[in-house]
């Protein structure tokens, strides 16, 4: 958490693992700097241990390839991929990209520790004149549907 800024972690979608070293080192050398959240895409099983070993905070599992916000069109081997990440992860495993409803993730709740809803929140805010009540109501409904 960076004092006064409220930033606990950074998610940088297109930063390859092999190019993270310099940024990670810089963040680790600054007191109170945010952590770098590791993104893991549906990749070959062999890369998953490397991608997860130094994770901090949580792992952001990308549920599908392409652009976020287009709906739940998850990778065809989503369960196998998530199980492999979970098996190797030292931190909670969250899944995001294309999640709009509890139904989108209910069949994966036995594997993931949480769901990340991003683009849909932005859409709700825009549709409701940036009134946070719409997002709060959405979260309550989502939680109720997930029995959380």
Describe these PLM feature segments.
Residues 10-12, 36-39, 59-61, 93-97, ...:
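Hydrophobic faces of well-ordered beta-strands that scaffold small-molecule active sites
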Residues 2, 51, 108, 118, ...:
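Conserved, mostly hydrophobic/aromatic
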Residues 3, 24-31, 79-88, 139-147:
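Surface-exposed amphipathic alpha-helices with a cationic face
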């Amino acid at each position: 958490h960076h004092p006064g800024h409220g930033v606990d972690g950074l998610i940088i979608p297109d930063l390859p693992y092999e190019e993270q070293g310099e940024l990670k080192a810089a963040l680790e050398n600054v007191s109170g700097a945010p952590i770098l959240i590791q993104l893991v895409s549906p990749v070959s099983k062999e890369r998953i241990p490397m991608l997860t070993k130094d994770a901090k905070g949580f792992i952001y599992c990308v549920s599908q390839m392409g652009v976020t916000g287009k709906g739940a069109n998850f990778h065809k081997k989503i369960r196998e991929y998530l199980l492999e990440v979970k098996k190797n992860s030292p931190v909670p495993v969250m899944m995001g990209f294309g999640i709009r409803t509890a139904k989108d993730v209910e069949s994966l709740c036995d594997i993931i520790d949480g769901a990340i809803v991003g683009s849909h929140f932005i859409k709700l805010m825009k549709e409701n004149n940036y009134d946070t009540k719409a997002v709060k109501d959405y979260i309550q409904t989502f939680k109720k549907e997930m029995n959380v």
